[in-house]
């Protein structure tokens, strides 16, 4: 099942046009390699000798499923994704293995990644197609709270120059979770959202596409911080009851695209429920994302998040 945003079938909206872009965001849920290189508890946990028994075979099974998913999107939209924003990535080496050892090696993807100060050792990253664009400027925005750097993911920004010379600013986020309680953690998510607004204000750009796992739903107060700066393309989907994660039979929408107001009429967001990424709920009717582990037990899926897609229809003299 595939959910469509804004009442428009993206499949028939001309996404194969050379003047359009297909942008994906996906939280890959603990995308670690199988080697314990001594960089933290999560690195040890997700290793061949760790508690999860995260072996080379299991790692490459996940890599193959990620590649298959992107190829599925390529079939659906008439072109492989031009930009893929990712969350919960251990390091650049994981992405190199993904691109070199799966069917993605046939495509010209390049990596933008920087290590962050996240306490779990996970980062955000960008994959982009070299034939479609190149980065002109890359920067990080570090969220601060009460004068101290948050031990969370940095916000990754890349100013991308498209093949025709036009520019678009890509921003990838993974805001602090609700671990420890929603109210206790709210101030940290507010701080991350404030950092996002500060970054956007510094760009003086009207072609911003921000994406990420915001660990908040579109009606959360934190999104008021960016009112007037970015438009939340996920809001109509959320109002319909759609979501990207599912808990106790209920969908929640925490993965989103936020765009410059000038782009709102030329972009559409979709939640991808790719059949082989879904599994039946055991206690509730319906499907849920097929994750890699159920508690400590390996079950062979990819992530507890559905990927999301933004189709960006540039048109004549659009940017």
What is each residue range found by the language model?
Residues 11-102, 112-116, 122, 194, ...:
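N-terminal, active-site-proximal structural segment of metallo-dependent hydrolase catalytic domains
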Residues 13, 198-208, 216-319:
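Metal-dependent phosphoester-hydrolase catalytic domains
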Residues 16-23, 32, 132-134, 151-176, ...:
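Beta-strand-turn-beta hairpins that frame and shape the catalytic cleft
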Residues 28-31, 89, 175, 213-214, ...:
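Active-site metal-binding loops of divalent metal-dependent hydrolases
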Residues 49-59, 80-86, 113-114, 144-146, ...:
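Second-shell loop/turn segments in exported
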Residues 83, 89-167:
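Structured beta-strand-rich core segments of catalytic domains in phosphoester-bond hydrolases
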Residues 91-93, 119-121, 178-180, 215-221, ...:
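Active-site environment of divalent metal-dependent phosphoester hydrolases
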Residues 113, 156-238:
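Extracytoplasmic, non-cytosolic globular domains
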